[in-house]
Curated annotation (Swiss-Prot):
GO molecular function: glucosamine-6-phosphate deaminase activity; identical protein binding
Catalytic activity: alpha-D-glucosamine 6-phosphate + H2O = beta-D-fructose 6-phosphate + NH4(+)
Organism of derivation: Blochmanniella floridana
Protein name from the UniProt record: Glucosamine-6-phosphate deaminase
Protein family according to the UniProt entry: Belongs to the glucosamine/galactosamine-6-phosphate isomerase family. NagB subfamily.
Signal peptide as annotated in the record: none
Length: 267
């Protein structure tokens, strides 16, 4: 696992957006060979999306031959509801770039057969091959997408019961009314995520510090879903200063020295 320590959320967003653009442009996607990008919702990526829109407007990247898969969606909320992840991504990113709508893939939490929807999503990903780059966030309890503590590392896209802690955290998007937050959601599984060629996890804010500590210094443990990323050959955890307060000083220094040495080699 690679860990990048930055000072604040602005620097995190600049790093992540710059890396996404570099990956797309280096890949040189075409209509027959698109770049497969996994994206999250929530508060963590908002600044990253703003940066990506600005860079697109400046002509530094095109999303014409990019195919997007999202991580999760609530069950029982319509796609045009302001609290739906579909609506969120359209408002904050999709509607501002040159991507074809048929290249944007969402889970549908309003279908009659939810299990079939999960199978359909897995097959759709497989029809393209493995996702080239999956961007994600992490919850303060270590959940990734809606893979709550206790999730199997072999899990696939499925229906997931949301914990009270997750619903309390997400209540800010529902006028701070926990009773308005759905109790169930569709989510990609941890195994689905781990099949991606590369993963970047954004961790910002002191409330993510315990999860960051578990991901970097802790053992692989299903009570901290983020720890599964220790199995992945190419994962980068991007942290602001506040999210690192639970780490040992020697851990921070170790990864900072690695990053300095990497920069010397590759620059």
């Amino acid at each position: 696992m690679k860990v990048v320590f930055l000072d604040n959320t602005d620097q995190v967003a600049q790093w992540v957006s710059g890396y996404i653009i570099w990956k797309i442009n280096s890949f040189k996607p075409t209509i027959s060979r698109p770049f497969l990008l996994g994206l999250p919702t929530g508060s963590s990526p908002i600044k990253t999306y703003k940066n990506l829109i600005k860079l697109y407007q400046d002509g530094q990247v095109s999303f014409k031959y990019v195919v997007i898969f999202t991580m999760d969606e609530y069950i029982g909320i319509s796609s045009d509801d302001p609290t739906s992840y579909c609506k969120f991504l359209h408002d904050n990113f999709i509607d501002h770039i040159d991507i074809a709508q048929e290249n944007v893939n969402f889970l549908n939490g309003n279908v009659t057969d939810l299990n079939y929807e999960c199978e359909r999503y897995e097959k759709k990903i497989k029809s393209y091959g493995n996702i080239h780059l999956f961007i994600g966030g992490v919850g303060k309890d270590g959940h990734v997408a809606f893979n709550e503590p206790g999730s199997s590392f072999n899990s696939r896209t499925r229906v997931k019961n949301l914990s009270r802690e997750t619903r309390l955290s997400n209540a800010r998007f529902f006028s701070y009314k926990i009773e308005a937050v759905p109790k169930f959601a569709l989510t990609i599984g941890l195994a689905t995520l781990l099949e991606s060629q590369e993963i970047i996890i954004i961790a910002t804010g002191q409330d993510k510090a315990a999860a960051v500590q578990a991901a970097i210094e802790g053992s692989v443990n299903h009570t901290w879903p983020i720890s599964c990323l220790q199995f992945h050959p190419k994962t980068t955890l991007i942290c602001d200063e506040l999210s690192t307060v639970e780490l040992k000083i020697k851990t921070v220094k170790y990864f900072q020295e690695l990053e300095v040495n990497n920069n010397k080699i590759f620059n």
